[in-house]
Design a protein with these regions (language model features):
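Oligomerization/assembly interface segments of phage tail-like spikes and tubes
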Residues: 27-45, 80-91, 210, 267-268, ...
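Surface-exposed cap/loop segments at beta↔alpha junctions
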Residues: 46-127
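Solvent-exposed edge beta-strands and adjacent loop segments
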Residues: 1-32, 187-201
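Cys-His-centered catalytic/binding microenvironment captured across papain-like cysteine peptidases
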Residues: 90-92, 105-111, 331-347
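Acidic, small/polar-enriched beta strand-loop surface segments
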Residues: 2-5, 180-319, 331-332, 343-347
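Short beta-strand and beta-hairpin "edge-sheet" elements
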Residues: 58-86, 164-166, 294-317, 322
Length: 347
C-alpha cells in the first residue's frame, strides 16, 4: 500500500504515518459533493513525532492527493491516547476565496470560471474538457458575490458539469461525457447481496424538438419554421411505443446549421429512460474509478443497464475489503438533491 504522509500547514515538515488503525482508514468520494479521508491513530513509541504532527489545518497526503485536516477528536482509553481525524480534499479550501463582483448576460462556462478567478487564483488552475461542444451558453443574472466553492457549484448545476480535482488543478467535463464504459459488472447475488436503489420515471420523455440557427433577417417577434436555416426537427424515441408520446422541452441552439447534426444532438439530449440511483456493497473488490459506467444487473426487476459510479468509499489498508459504491444514471445524485434542499432551508 502507498504511504500516508502527515505534513504541517507551512509544508516544511513531513512524516510517514505508521501504527494507525487500518480498519478505520477510508477514502470517500461523492461526485460534485465530497472527497475526504478518515483514520484513527493511536499514539505509540514508533509514531510519536508523526502523531504530534497531526493537528487542525495540517495536511494528509495519500495516493498523490492532498487533504486538509478539518475535524479531529483527541481522546484516551486508559493510558492509550488516540486521534480521530477527517481530512477534506484540498479542492474544498477553494471556499476561502470570494468574488465580490457580478456579471450578467449570455455566458459560457469558461466565461464564468474566468470571472471567478479574476479575484485571485489562490494556487488553483482549471481547464474545461468538452471536445464535442456539449456545453451551451446560458443566461446569467448577477453571477458572483459569493465564495468560490458556491459559485463553482452553481456552474455545475447550471451547465450540467462535473469537476474532478487533481489537487488544485480542476478539470470540468460535461456530466454526460465523462467516465469510461468498463467490462466490470455488478450482479445481484453474484458479487453483491446488498442492493438499495430508487427508480423513478418523473423525467422520462419520448419526444423532443430542436431549433437551429436563425436566418439573418428572421422576424424574432413572430418566429415561424421558415425563419430557421433548416426546418425544426423532431426526434421520437422507440421508447414511445411502450410509454406513449411524452414531450420534452425543446432545444434551441444557434450553433446548429445542419439538420442531421441537430438530430444526433436531440438523441443525446432526450431523457428516454427511467432514473436509477442507489448503492451496493460488493462481496469483493472491483477495479472501478470515478465516473466509470458499469453494467448493473438486478434480475428480480429485470433490470440490466449501465449506471455511472458517482460515489466510492474504499479501504486502502485492507486489500480484500470491497468498496462501497454509489450508482446513478441521473444528472442529480441523491446527495446533491439533499444538499439543494438543505441550502433552501427545507431540511
Amino acid at each position: 500500500m502507498k504511504n500516508i504522509l502527515i505534513r504541517n500547514y507551512e509544508e516544511t515538515k513531513e512524516e510517514i504515518l505508521i501504527n494507525y488503525d487500518k480498519d478505520s482508514f477510508s477514502v470517500s468520494w461523492q461526485q460534485n459533493e465530497t472527497w475526504e479521508l478518515s483514520v484513527t491513530v493511536p499514539r505509540t513509541k514508533g509514531n510519536q513525532i508523526t502523531f504530534d504532527l497531526i493537528d487542525y489545518e495540517n495536511y494528509v497526503v495519500f495516493d498523490g492527493q492532498q487533504y486538509s485536516i478539518k475535524q479531529m477528536r483527541s481522546y484516551a482509553s486508559g493510558s492509550q491516547i488516540y486521534k480521530d481525524i477527517v481530512a477534506t480534499h484540498i479542492y474544498y479550501t477553494i471556499q476561502d476565496g470570494r468574488q465580490y463582483d457580478t456579471v450578467s448576460g449570455t455566458k459560457s462556462i469558461n466565461d464564468l470560471l474566468t470571472h471567478i478567478f479574476k479575484a485571485g487564483n489562490r494556487g488553483f488552475s482549471w481547464e474545461v474538457v468538452d471536445p464535442n461542444n456539449v456545453f451551451l451558453k446560458k443566461e446569467q443574472e448577477n453571477f458572483g458575490n459569493d465564495n468560490y466553492l458556491n459559485l463553482i457549484n452553481e456552474i455545475l448545476e447550471d451547465y450540467g458539469a462535473v469537476v474532478i480535482p487533481n489537487n488544485k488543478h480542476l478539470i470540468f467535463y460535461p456530466i454526460s461525457e465523462y467516465g469510461n464504459i468498463t467490462e466490470q459488472q455488478i450482479r445481484y447475488k453474484y458479487n453483491t447481496d446488498e442492493v438499495s436503489f430508487d427508480i423513478d420515471t418523473y423525467a422520462l420523455k419520448t419526444q423532443i424538438k430542436g431549433y437551429g440557427k436563425l436566418k439573418e433577417n428572421a422576424n424574432t417577434d413572430n418566429l415561424k419554421d421558415s425563419d430557421y436555416v433548416f426546418p425544426p426537427v423532431t426526434y421520437t424515441s422507440a421508447e414511445s411505443e411502450k410509454w406513449g408520446i411524452r414531450i420534452q422541452d425543446p432545444v434551441e441552439d444557434e450553433r446548429y446549421t445542419i439538420q442531421n447534426n441537430m438530430l444526433e444532438y436531440l438523441k443525446q439530449q432526450l431523457h428516454d429512460y427511467p432514473d436509477v440511483s442507489g448503492s451496493v456493497t460488493l462481496k469483493w473488490a472491483l477495479s472501478l474509478n470515478k465516473g466509470d459506467k458499469v453494467l448493473f444487473v438486478y434480475e428480480p426487476l429485470s433490470l440490466s443497464t449501465y449506471i455511472q459510479v458517482v460515489g466510492i468509499t474504499t479501504y486502502p489498508a485492507i486489500p480484500n475489503k470491497a468498496p462501497e459504491i454509489v450508482l446513478s444514471n441521473t444528472k442529480k445524485t441523491i446527495t446533491s438533491i439533499l444538499a439543494n434542499l438543505a441550502r433552501k432551508g427545507l431540511m
